[in-house]
Amino acid sequence: MGYQRKETGGQERRIKLYYFSWLANKTGRESEELVLPPSVTTVTELLDLLRKRRYQIAQAFDESLLRPTVNKQFAEFFTRLEDGDEVALVPNRPTPPATPDI
């Protein structure tokens, strides 16, 4: 999936982001809509952005803890993000990392 996507050319891209399991509890929401800055083109860069925006729970966005999906298909972290994508972050272990309660 990641290889088949094209570069966006600097257009504004909106995605729908879903959180599951303990990640929904840590973030306090099950989903949100984001407008991606031009610097965020892949799932890895999205996780970097989330770590910066939610620095109190940055450990929760570690790649080793999550399995991403893009448009309901499991995806690699290098998968490019396009306008209208649905991205889900699914924890790959049942217990969350230790982070301060918010």
Predicted features by range, described:
Residues 1-102:
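Ubiquitin-like/PB1-type beta-grasp interaction modules and other compact soluble beta-rich domains
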